[in-house]
């Protein structure tokens, strides 16, 4: 079963992919066919009673210096995801 995963983490451009456990989780989730969307905690806000963020589709690869691609941001409610992964 494919899951739709939102991941809250530090800026992905600044991580060291060789030692980052969040990055390892993302690689495995992607390998298993799950959809991944990315946001940083400073972008969270409330819309009524919903927690929302500008989420970006995320593709990761095990290449130092070229380890991710982000899609266009779209403001979405976090309760629409199967999994919300908080990694800080």
For the regions a language model picked out, list residue spans one by one:
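ATP-binding N-terminal substructure of ATP-dependent carboxylate-amine bond-forming enzymes
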Residues: 1-88
